[in-house]
């Protein structure tokens, strides 16, 4: 979460530099920072962060409304995104009327509606049951394969096993990393589990 806060320009690193594209985050002024986050970053949270008094449609469109995007363009972005995420029939409903998995899909749509350079996901499966978790992870796989960069913080081995690269952070440092390679999710799951067991018992090496 600390790493995500730094990447979101909510916190500043004690040393080093953070770049998004060619822009150094610490060089973005306080006046610009809110617009910078809205235009370049998408956020998905464990608890969805949807407004209960807004329909799913209004929740998803909120970042574009705040950016002053014309209504026609908002609708042009919303339709294919809602279709892809399987929530078109739910857009008029309110968050309290849909399931946790459907809320998270709406939250993902809100994060993607601005066409961000980077999607930040903080424990996105933490509040979901097994079925909804599987659905969200498949969704993330599809989004990633379409060219969207996703950085996910998770304590779930299952969620991590869907990634292309896993970083293990210990005491604030990158302690080890794994790349998926050509193996299956199950193969990668086992490699992640084995690495965690080594780290928990004091083994492993920095990489």
Language-model features, listed with the residues they occupy:
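Helix-to-loop junction immediately C-terminal to a conserved catalytic motif
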Residues: 8
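Conserved ABC transporter NBD signature motif
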Residues: 16-24
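Short coil-to-helix segment of the ABC ATPase nucleotide-binding domain corresponding to the Q-loop/switch region
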Residues: 54-62
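Conserved ABC ATPase signature
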Residues: 94-98, 102-104
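A short, proline-enriched helix->beta-strand linker immediately N-terminal to the Walker B motif
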Residues: 113-117
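Catalytic Walker B motif of ABC-type/P-loop ATPase nucleotide-binding domains
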Residues: 119-122
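Conserved beta-strand-loop-alpha-helix hinge in the C-terminal portion
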Residues: 173-197
